[in-house]
């Protein structure tokens, strides 16, 4: 959240919006751990670079005593995603904030802090945004995808994400979260994302019923054991996964609007 504050001070949200799992966790109380920061430009700009915002991020981190550096990732020339990392020494920061702690309990954490953030520099049209205000770590403003647009991104991920040939369980968990909170989907954004991914043809007569059919087909193909194993490390109440099955996901998809 300190990184988000630094980006805000640098004017980043005049040209980009926040979306993805971490946006859900921070602003909509998704009960799943997520730390990567995902953004999309408000309009395509293939020449966009993140470097101009690095100083703002580093200054914000240093204001809170965090000695972290920001570095960019070499971009694949054919990719629409530009990436950067915030990195630092975990041990240094544990000692700084908890000088009397027994470090044995942090054995699993004693590696470099590494937060990835990615920006889609050529996003499809159709997203809807809202401006939100955060008071902590200090007052700042963020441009955020609407809940409906966030849901569109999640459905696109379920249908199209190429993740080691498997469905990412975290996507399924978030799908249940959206439906449980009665969030409708931004159908225009889903359509445009699916067209961009060559999942559907541009001339298709696309509507909510067609989308449900695509999801039902997908939910019939998923290995739910593997999907559960993916999400287990990121949630506290693992019993909520017991019901996961083809029939469960097909049934709740009837509630999609």
Provide a role label for each language-model segment:
Residues 19-22:
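Glycine-rich beta-strand-to-loop/alpha-helix junction loops that act as flexible
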Residues 25-34:
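Short glycine-biased active-site loop of nucleotidyltransferases that positions the nucleotide triphosphate
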Residues 37:
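Structural signature of FAD isoalloxazine-binding scaffolds in flavoprotein oxidoreductases
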Residues 1-16, 27, 42-257:
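Structured mid-to-C-terminal alpha-helical surface segments
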